[in-house]
Curated annotation (Swiss-Prot):
Cofactor(s) recorded in Swiss-Prot or TrEMBL: Mg(2+)
Cofactor note: Binds 2 magnesium ions per tetramer.
EC numbers, comma separated: 6.1.1.20
Molecular-function annotations in GO: ATP binding; magnesium ion binding; phenylalanine-tRNA ligase activity; tRNA binding
Gene, per the UniProt record: pheS
GO process annotations (BP): phenylalanyl-tRNA aminoacylation
Enzyme class: ligase
Name of the protein in question: Phenylalanine--tRNA ligase alpha subunit
Subunit-level organization: Tetramer of two alpha and two beta subunits.
GO cellular component, one term: cytoplasm
Length: 344
């Protein structure tokens, strides 16, 4: 057993001098491997007298357990030292300023929409919203749009099939005017409200997309008149484009839900004499407007003998294109960062 004590002391000393895990495994194999010195002692138990085997076997197993414990401690010590060295090497100076990350920005349509809402809110308009899937009544009938009107045709409107795939009275709203109908049903006049939101029409080209954004406005009280309508819209356009000298004009037009009706033009913001944007006329059509038709009031139980009102509707993408000088509407929907970063 003297040899065993010497072997144990020698192995532990070698373990403690080892500084590398790979080298430690080699030392382990030397003493505890399949052909290791301690393993050979266990194999040699058959050569000693039977009465001495139990004591010898117990002593060898104790030595083996001691070596395995020493090996485990040394392995942990090497790993801890290696981790400490790695942490020191990779130490970060937390007092240094961080690396800047790219800042996002609002989409140009969002910028234009927020500007429109802010300008109308500044003169007392409330913002209202409503469902994008509407019924035939709110989208057409309540707005004095008869069944024979072209807007009801399949090629102009996205209709939603019923559960069985048949015809349905539901559709994707073609304007945000239904929001105004719903608002009038639950809010007695006087009132001033704008209805921004997405609308849908079967159209797609350089200046139209199947989905776009509109803001429609409504003012109802006992003294609303066309003069006030012209003043509010003229003032809005001058502030939106930040041009006090922006010329405007109103042309007679027709909309089923207003009478009289008009379309508003502004002087071309791209030129002064004529260009491709304004078709060389010097004018740009920007919105439709008019005095609310009595039949619309009738559908929402408002006394048209007591109250009068005016309404208007404008396309957000249209104004954004003019404000930012964009010549293709589809650029707003392609999510090209080269385009969007220009508005940050």
């Amino acid at each position: 057993m003297t040899h065993l004590d010497h072997l144990l002391t020698e192995a532990i000393e070698l373990f403690n001098r080892t500084e590398d895990l790979a080298e430690l495994e080699q030392v382990k194999a030397r003493y505890l491997g399949r052909h290791g010195q301690l393993t050979e002692l266990l194999k040699g138990l058959g050569k000693i007298p039977p009465e001495e085997r139990p004591a010898a076997g117990s002593r060898i197993n104790q030595a083996k357990e001691s070596l395995e414990a020493a090996l485990s401690r040394r392995r942990e010590a090497i790993q801890e030292k290696k981790l400490e060295e790695q942490l020191i090497e990779e130490k970060l100076d937390v007092t240094l300023s961080g690396r800047g990350t790219g800042m996002g920005g609002l989409h140009p349509i969002t910028l234009a929409l927020e500007r429109i809402q802010s300008l109308f809110h500044s003169v007392g308009f409330t913002v209202a919203s409503g469902p994008e899937i509407e019924t035939d009544f709110y989208n057409f009938t309540a707005l004095n749009i008869p069944e024979s009107h072209p807007a009801r045709a399949m090629h102009d409107t996205f209709y939603v099939d019923d559960e069985n795939g048949g015809a349905s009275e539901h559709l994707l709203r073609t304007h945000t005017s239904p929001v105004q109908i719903r608002y009038m049903e639950s809010n007695p006049p006087p009132l001033k409200v704008i209805a921004p939101g997405r609308v849908y029409r079967c159209d797609s080209d350089l200046t139209h997309t199947p989905m776009f954004h509109q803001v429609e406005g409504l003012w109802i009280d006992e003294s609303a008149n066309f003069s006030a309508l012209k003043g509010i819209l003229s003032d809005f356009m001058q502030h939106f484009f930040e041009r006090d000298d922006l010329p405007v004009r109103f042309r007679p037009s027709f909309f089923p839900f207003t009478e009289p009706s008009a379309e508003m033009d502004i002087g071309c913001v791209m030129c002064k004499t004529g260009c491709r944007v304004c078709s060389y006329t010097g004018w740009l059509e920007v919105l439709g407007c008019g005095m609310v038709h009595p039949n619309v009031f009738k559908h929402v139980n408002i006394d048209s003998q007591k109250y009068v009102g005016f309404a208007f509707g404008l396309g957000v993408e249209r104004l954004a294109m003019l404000r930012y000088g964009v010549n293709d509407l589809r650029l707003f929907f392609e999510n090209d960062l080269r385009f969007l970063k220009q508005f940050n």
